[in-house]
């Protein structure tokens, strides 16, 4: 089964093709002005509308049939969890799934983080049983109780969270002070890997 996944989160436009393994993984960071610590949602939406066709083009140009489309539609699987930037991916995904006459699956950005972590760790078997996950990303520092829902997707229930500055925000603030482009995590990681003392 060949599936196209789309995610238009607050700072990255992403698309991937998966068929038992990752066949394509394309992404573009949203441009953030030097010294800024983020984007307004209206700016994020604007950039996703411009970037998603560029991200999808190399995938779609191959003309390979897809069996399903998956798309993140909210930050978390919780009532009231909403950011306008996810509407861009949702609209593109619905159009593609409709044109291809294939099913579409909706999930949260957080579910994507959980599934990606399990995939990269070779632990997809955990999707069939309850486990504890730590989601440390951007504006999120949370401990989550995760169990499969009736569709087999990871359903996360908040167990604990930071009450002040989130870990990702701390990384970004330090990075901006160092003059790095936002979001700063990838650039700080490169600096750390180059450090020899």
Feature roles, as predicted:
Residues 5-6, 70-71, 104-109, 165:
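General beta-strand structural signal in soluble alpha/beta enzymes
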Residues 57-94, 98:
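Short beta-strand-loop/turn "lid" adjacent to the catalytic site in phosphate-handling enzymes
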Residues 27, 40, 44-64:
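Conserved phosphate-binding loops in N-terminal lobes of ATP-dependent enzymes
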Residues 8-46, 151-159:
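Short glycine-rich, Thr/Ser-proximal phosphate-binding strand/loop in the N-terminal lobe
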Residues 12, 72-77, 108-114, 140:
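Acidic, glycine-rich active-site loops and adjacent beta-strand->loop/helix elements
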């Amino acid at each position: 089964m060949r599936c196209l996944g789309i995610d238009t989160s607050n700072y990255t436009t992403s698309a991937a093709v998966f068929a038992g393994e990752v066949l394509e993984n394309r992404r573009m960071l949203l441009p953030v002005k030097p010294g800024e610590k983020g984007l307004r949602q209206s700016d994020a939406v604007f950039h996703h509308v411009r970037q998603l066709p560029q991200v999808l083009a190399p995938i779609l140009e191959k003309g390979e049939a897809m069996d399903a489309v998956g798309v993140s539609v909210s930050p978390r699987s919780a009532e009231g969890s909403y950011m306008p930037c996810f509407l861009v991916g949702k609209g593109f995904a619905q159009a593609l799934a409709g044109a291809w006459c294939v099913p579409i699956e909706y999930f949260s950005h957080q579910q994507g983080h959980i599934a990606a972590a399990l995939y990269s760790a070779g632990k997809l078997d955990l999707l069939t049983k309850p486990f504890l996950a730590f989601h440390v990303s951007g504006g999120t520092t949370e401990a989550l109780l995760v169990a499969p829902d009736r569709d087999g997707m990871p359903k996360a229930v908040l167990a604990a969270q930071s009450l002040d500055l989130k870990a990702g925000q701390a990384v970004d603030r330090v990075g901006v002070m160092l003059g790095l482009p936002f979001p700063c995590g990838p650039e700080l990681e490169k600096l750390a890997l180059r450090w020899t003392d």
